[in-house]
Amino acid sequence: QNDIISIYDFSSFAQELCDLSLDGILTTFSALLSESSHLTFEVFDVEVLMKTKTMLFSSSPQKVVFETFDRKQRLNICSETTHFYDQMRYQLLPDDFQLEIDFEGNPLSEIFDKLSNIFSLIYLSSSASLNRGILELHIAGQRTLEYQCRCNSIASNPELYKIYNWIYTDGNATDKSLIARNILCLHCRFSDIQKIDGKTFASIQSNYNLYLKDNVAQYIQLTNKLAEFISDVVSKTGDYAVSLLEKFKTNLFAILGFLFTVVLANIVSDQPLDNIFTRDITFILEAVLFI
């Protein structure tokens, strides 16, 4: 279900939104998005077009279609990968603010970009908290990275969202996040995580590809060992079946020989067969046949 909110003075709306505290902005959007999968703001006074994966500001909203994006599933995956202490209060994602479509002179571009960066940093971390405008991050990798900054000082850096989006789109988010955090801890040992560049992302992708190759090699090795085991079991089963058949044949010939001897002896004696095949003799014959 998509909710439509009418805006009759876009400039005033943008000014009032930017004048809110960070907590006020986040609380407002979190409440709105908790009730709807997408938000549509229909602007009546000026021509605008601004879009994220979950929000649209447009003078003609009926002409714009949202792409499929399971927001609840993404929130669940993020919560499994990162412990964000304030997630119940701020159920928001970088995707809610990452602009896919923008227009020149947009008064909301800066605040949306800042919010996208804040939540990208949060979900790149092992754990994070957001309190009174202070963002605290803990990133556990080969080293441990502790980071703290004021949210109003966070600068624009598209690489943060790129890494976040790569982690949580396709593949195993847990494995990807662990590799990303290892690289971030190494690359940001003496530099600010906000200043990472394309080389950091390239290094993360390269290490992940090596990880996949190692996993494929281990899978092939395990498959080969399993095939050898199955082949060995089948071979031993066949040998056992042949051995069992040979024993059965041997015992069968012995029984036939015994019966022939008994019948022959009965011909030359006056003792009836009923007295020879007693219950005990029959039990012994059956035991010999099937041993």
PLM segments and residue spans:
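Extended aliphatic helical segments
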Residues: 43-48, 64-65, 216, 233-234, ...
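A contiguous, surface-oriented mixed alpha/beta subdomain in the mid-to-C-terminal portion of proteins
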Residues: 208-216, 220-223, 247, 266-271
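Short, non-transmembrane cytosolic segments of multipass membrane proteins
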Residues: 179-218
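Transmembrane alpha-helical hairpins and terminal membrane-anchor modules
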Residues: 250-291
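Extended, non-transmembrane interaction/recognition domains
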Residues: 2-195
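Transmembrane alpha-helical segments and their cytosolic interface motifs
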Residues: 222-266
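Alpha-helical transmembrane segments of integral membrane proteins, especially early/N-terminal helices
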Residues: 158-176, 207-215, 244-256
